[in-house]
């Protein structure tokens, strides 16, 4: 099978994004390959095919960007190569406009990953919140232009069918929760906040759902991080604990406890 190289997303316009890719030198007949360009709002999918089949073409222009692009949304791309005679397929790396880090940044990311996976991190899952696509057929009101049921089991209160993209597992350092009692003249309630530090992937943004190794559900309320030459090295996010009984408690997380390591080995 062929191997991809130099995948990149480039654009200096608000009207489109250009996706380029190359193939490493090979003795195979490239005329027997079909390329399909896929786009997603989350690194783990689901993926939408936006171009293909392409034969001996290594560039496309995504002109649907103006309808779905905002400052708070990152679009990810990958290329699927299908060998028509054999039916075998392979995929490129997932890329966005930020691009791939240089060697120094990759080494910093590698050391951070070892730190989180072997010493200070715990297993977490990130559900990226949907922000475009099919509106919820059950709770979205076309006349009012908004969702009318915050406890809808179809969109999980987001207004978009499905609510969240596929979850991504990662290792992150989760701080002890900060507890605050909010007291008013009518009632009072306890609010818990925390902070999580993680590597550059998966990309975390406000309103995403994070589930920790204790099955606590957190809402991302603020994001920041560290970058080198435009490439993200570390992400830091402030979290708010979702109250018990909320609709987010019913979102299923399908894992096998026997095969998942939740915390690093304790020496």
Descriptions of predicted regions:
Residues 1-30, 86-105:
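Pro/Thr/Ser/Gly-rich low-complexity, intrinsically disordered linker/stalk tracts
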Residues 125, 157-193:
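Short beta-strand/loop turn elements enriched in aromatics
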Residues 209, 216-227:
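Short beta-strand-centered aromatic/proline hotspots
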Residues 99-146:
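Active-site-proximal polar cores
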Residues 183-184, 226-243:
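Short, solvent-exposed secondary-structure boundary/capping segments
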Residues 23-49:
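Solvent-exposed loop/turn segments flanking beta-strands in beta-repeat/beta-sandwich domains
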Residues 62-87:
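Beta-strand-rich modules
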Residues 115-123, 239-267:
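Glycine- and charge-enriched low-complexity intrinsically disordered segments
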